[in-house]
């Protein structure tokens, strides 16, 4: 059929008076799209059939006999700004995959919820002066409308928000199970692994039966402990527990933050406010108990390597030893100072020790320094006690970044105490310094200035000795003399020196590691430490326990109440959910960003009627006090994927039968080691927050028997980012990108850009409201239609890569759809124009090769290359006198996951009554797959001089012979100096020019 694009294409793709009634333009696209979206909704086209319950109907009737496929996106925050065209990239990709698998005969679960608690929603409500629930629900409604208009094939029965009452109930229920659980590192799991969460009642039974010694009360029976002591003992074991330790306090936000929410610069991830270390009583999650499993099980899941690496680095597994130093305190008692080091071989070079300003040993320092203490060790203070108190206050007023950064002078204070080196017996002066943090390791370090830059700088500042214990390898080209007295020799390999003693402090035996390589020395010293009872080899992790409290209003309340003695009690499951009270004052109390001494005040604490409650927890009605903190926004997103299986289930967090069918480890054809969601699509920015937290919660629920797989997400795919040009005037102010005009080339290879006649500068980066370069999906729907929008986003490049948005390029996708439409539909009458003609040989081969190739591209999530192949096929059909049904129907089927509305319309006009969403994906006829010939390019000095049609199986020698014959005249009868053959497509010739 003849292609007459230029006769009718308009700049804005809108219909004009002269256009035929059934020409595919933006207006017709909108009519088609909205009509089919209504039909899909009414017929339940995308309803996925459950094993049982209310969700087993829809067009997927009897679908539970089919294999399952669970695809999902990282659900969005319901922002007040709504969506711009960059947001749906992942949603569209997942939708294409879901539609493809549906056409392969699988029962596809694809749904969308909303992550509605937390700081983003609360801050938007504060800005608008409205209650968070009002603004959040309005934002959800707008976002749901935008997504629906996109034609995403969600099962809308499964949609929910994390603020929904029934959802909050189960989030609180999960917390209660983690509170009522402890981690037993020696327990053998059902999968044969070691270490598991267990019910706290089993721990109590072990205490009662004396099977396990009660920490701190070895001489007492469990029944002899009062309830406060019992609660304290259990708190030290619980997975969800109350901690009083240094936390990240952010005065500017009025709340504490998890480590993962603090940037490398020591600022809050949201708002960029300073963050300070404070000792506060907070809820924490014992994620560190799962550190090893979180690392090891990365090997069982199909995730991008960069995300796995980010999680491994964040968890920070290291191998070393715990070493115990004796410290004689001011009260005459000898106390233990535990240090973790990855280099126990350097004990011979340890010349002092340092503790954090929050280390408990500082409660046992003397009143004053001895007369022999150097003035440089006193920090200018006359009194040790007063100096220590002031130094601690100064350190706590700094951010973690300021305390640990290498730049600047090293500060510290001698504590008046000495630690005894367990190997050499040397008395090591014990300092307190701000660069050691209590939240990392043990809050104490053994300082080795000969091998560590910070220790070296500290030693120089305080006049402490430097001992080198490692020298460079002989073939390294380095000499220790180049470092001696000038810098530390920092190396993980080398030859050990200055490391021997005739009589060790602890055992009195001789110990020497001189002459050994570092790794051998580490092993030998670790063995000695264990034999001496002053150390043990162990694995340590950078990962800290997850701070789980927030002093905010807009979050899930904890299902916890406190009695008159301050003992925490779980609210019974029958009382869940604990709802947020509607309070007039929900804004957090914030402070000046640098007010490190400010105190958190939770908004819920202001509502006394809600805080004070009468409950019967088994021993009569008593007065209790609710916990006034709320959970972080990560709580709701930790487990939402499971609620898609049945968001209306009032009896279970997730039903075991539904879990086995949708996420189990023994599904036919999907015997994954990990089980879990088949495909999870989202941004890489969530690698160490949401993804790590979800894996942790899931493993705990797995241990406790609530789920049947150890991992939540089997395959993870990170989409790239859609970026855009922004424009600034001479003042550096952003101007509306859609009002900028592109002018002539400036003469240096770049076009010029003007805004209302004024020259502006172009920059490339993110799309955002402040940059005035946002394009909304609503604009695309109105001016091009949802299918053109979908087609453009999917054709822009590989899904995993970032790409620039350019509205001017959208028209290319529109023209492709117009050409395809004309191949099926008469623009004047709307009638179907395809014929029943048989396919010629050329069309048969092109069609079947296209089916084979597009299937491969869809499996690999490469819709951009699939689209390119479909365009080639459509162009061929356009060149035919008549378009045969046998060729165009497979084309429409293959395009339908990408442009579903227009394909539904064409499928209907082709005479089909069943939705194309459930039509069978085409299968190629292998007799017509594979090319008869391929084009071989012959190059001389990099320039193409001939093209040959050859057998795709031709060998290199035959291809070389044909190529030389084809360019013989250009070689002037001479043999070439070199011939490079890459059969069957390239021959590169280097001529002999001598």
What does each model-found stretch correspond to?
Residues 37, 284-318, 360-413, 576-609, ...:
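Amphipathic alpha-helical
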Residues 2-29, 34-35, 39-43, 128-337, ...:
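Residue patterns forming the tRNA-binding/recognition surfaces of aminoacyl-tRNA synthetases
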Residues 94-95, 107, 364-473, 478, ...:
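Catalytic alpha/beta core of large soluble enzyme barrels
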Residues 23-27, 134, 317-322, 471, ...:
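Long, charged, mostly alpha-helical binding arms that flank functional sites
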Residues 54-132, 136, 160-171, 339-342, ...:
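N-terminal catalytic cores of NTP/NDP-binding nucleotidyl/phosphoryl-transfer enzymes
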Residues 115, 186-193, 236, 241-248, ...:
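Helix-rich, typically C-terminal accessory recognition domains appended to large enzymatic cores
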Residues 2-13, 17-72, 102-111, 135-141, ...:
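Conserved oxyanion/phosphate-binding beta-strand-loop segments in alpha/beta enzyme cores
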């Amino acid at each position: 059929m003849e292609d007459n694009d230029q006769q009718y294409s308009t700049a804005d793709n809108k219909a004009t008076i002269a256009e035929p009634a059934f020409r595919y333009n933006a207006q017709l696209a909108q009519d088609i799209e909205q009509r089919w979206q209504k039909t899909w909704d009414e017929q339940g086209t995308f309803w996925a059939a459950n094993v049982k319950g209310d969700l087993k109907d829809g067009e997927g009737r009897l679908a539970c006999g089919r294999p399952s496929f669970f695809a999902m996106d990282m659900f969005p925050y319901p922002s007040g700004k709504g969506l711009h065209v960059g947001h749906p990239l992942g949603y569209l990709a997942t939708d294409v995959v879901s539609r493809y698998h549906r056409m392969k005969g699988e029962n596809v679960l694809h749904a969308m919820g909303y992550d509605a608690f937390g700081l983003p929603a609360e801050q938007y409500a504060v800005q608008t002066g409205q209650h968070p629930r009002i603004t959040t629900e309005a934002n959800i409604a707008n976002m749901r409308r935008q997504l629906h208009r996109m034609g995403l094939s969600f099962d809308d029965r499964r949609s929910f928000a994390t603020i929904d009452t029934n959802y909050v109930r189960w989030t609180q229920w999960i917390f209660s199970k983690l509170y009522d659980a402890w981690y037993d590192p020696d327990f053998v799991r059902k999968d044969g692994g070691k270490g598991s969460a267990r019910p706290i009642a089993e721990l109590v039974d072990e205490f009662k039966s004396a099977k396990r010694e009660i920490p701190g009360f070895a001489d007492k029976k469990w029944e002899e402990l009062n309830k406060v002591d019992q609660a304290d003992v259990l708190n030290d074991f619980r997975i969800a527990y109350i901690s009083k330790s240094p936390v990240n306090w952010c005065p500017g936000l009025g709340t504490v933050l998890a480590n993962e929410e603090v940037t490398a610069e020591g600022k809050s991830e949201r708002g960029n406010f300073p963050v300070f270390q404070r000792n506060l009583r907070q809820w924490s999650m014992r994620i560190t108990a799962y550190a090893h499993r979180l690392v090891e099980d990365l090997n069982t899941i199909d995730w991008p390597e960069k995300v796995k690496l980010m999680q491994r680095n964040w968890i920070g597994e290291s191998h070393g030893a715990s070493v115990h130093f004796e410290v004689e305190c001011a009260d005459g008692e000898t106390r233990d100072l535990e240090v973790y080091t990855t280099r126990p071989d350097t004990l011979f070079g340890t010349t002092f020790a340092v503790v954090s300003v929050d280390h408990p040993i500082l409660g046992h320092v003397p009143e004053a320094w001895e007369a022999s203490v150097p003035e440089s060790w006193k920090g200018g203070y006359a009194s040790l006690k007063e100096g220590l108190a002031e130094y601690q206050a100064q350190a706590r007023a700094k951010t973690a970044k300021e305390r640990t950064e290498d730049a600047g002078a090293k500060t510290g204070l001698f504590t008046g105490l000495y630690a005894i080196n367990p190997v050499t017996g040397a008395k090591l002066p014990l300092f307190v310094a701000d660069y050691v943090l209590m939240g990392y390791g043990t809050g104490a370090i053994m300082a080795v200035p000969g091998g560590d830059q910070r220790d070296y700088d500290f030693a120089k500042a305080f006049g402490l000795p430097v001992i080198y214990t490692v020298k460079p390898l002989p073939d390294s080209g380095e000499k220790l003399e180049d470092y001696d007295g000038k810098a530390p020799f920092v190396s993980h390999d080398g030859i050990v020196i200055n490391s021997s003693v005739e009589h060790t402090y602890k055992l009195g035996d001789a110990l020497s590691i001189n002459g050994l390589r570092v790794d051998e020395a580490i092993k030998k010293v670790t063995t000695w430490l264990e034999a001496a009872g002053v150390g043990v080899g162990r694995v340590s992790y950078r990962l800290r326990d997850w701070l789980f409290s927030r002093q905010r209003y807009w979050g899930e309340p904890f299902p916890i109440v406190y009695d008159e003695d301050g003992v925490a009690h779980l609210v019974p499951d029958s009382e869940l959910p604990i709802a947020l009270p509607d309070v007039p004052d929900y804004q957090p109390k914030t402070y000046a960003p640098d007010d490190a001494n400010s105190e958190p005040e939770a908004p819920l604490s202001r509502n006394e009627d809600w805080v004070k409650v009468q409950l019967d927890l088994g021993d009569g009605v008593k007065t209790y006090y609710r916990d006034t903190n709320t959970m972080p926004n990560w709580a709701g997103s930790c487990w939402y994927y499971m609620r898609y299986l049945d968001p209306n289930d009032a009896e279970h967090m997730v039903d075991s039968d539904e879990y086995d069918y949708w996420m189990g480890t023994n599904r036919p054809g999907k015997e994954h080691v990990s089980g879990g969601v088949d495909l999870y699509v989202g941004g890489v920015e969530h690698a160490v927050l949401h993804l790590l937290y979800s894996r942790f919660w899931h493993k705990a629920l797995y241990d406790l028997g609530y789920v049947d797989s150890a991992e939540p997400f089997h395959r993870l795919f990170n989409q790239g980012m859609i970026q855009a040009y922004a424009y600034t005037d001479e003042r550096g102010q952003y101007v509306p990108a859609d009002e900028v005009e592109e002018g002539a080339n400036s003469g240096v290879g770049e076009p010029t850009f003007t805004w209302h006649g004024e020259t502006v500068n172009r920059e490339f980066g993110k799309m955002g409201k402040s940059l005035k370069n946002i394009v909304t999906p609503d604009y695309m729907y109105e001016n091009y239609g949802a299918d053109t929008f979908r087609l453009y986003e999917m054709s822009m490049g590989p899904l995993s890569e970032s790409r620039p948005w350019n509205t001017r390029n959208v028209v290319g996708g529109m023209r492709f759809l117009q050409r395809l439409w004309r191949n099926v539909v008469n623009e004047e009458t709307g009638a179907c124009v395809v014929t029943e003609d048989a396919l010629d040989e050329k069309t048969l081969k092109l069609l079947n090769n296209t089916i084979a190739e597009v299937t491969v591209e869809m499996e690999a999530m490469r819709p951009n290359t699939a689209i390119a192949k479909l365009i080639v096929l459509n162009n061929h059909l356009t060149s035919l006198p008549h378009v045969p049904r046998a060729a165009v129907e497979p084309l429409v089927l293959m395009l339908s996951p990408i442009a579903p509305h227009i394909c539904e319309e064409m499928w209907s006009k082709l005479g089909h009554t069943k939705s194309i969403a459930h039509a069978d994906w085409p299968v190629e006829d292998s007799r017509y797959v594979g090319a008869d010939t391929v084009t071989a390019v012959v190059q001389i000095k990099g320039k193409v001089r001939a093209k040959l049609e050859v057998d795709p199986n031709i060998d290199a020698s035959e291809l070389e012979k044909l190529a030389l014959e084809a360019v013989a005249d250009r070689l002037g009868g001479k043999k070439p100096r070199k011939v490079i053959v890459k059969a069957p497509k390239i021959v590169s010739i280097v001529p002999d020019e001598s």
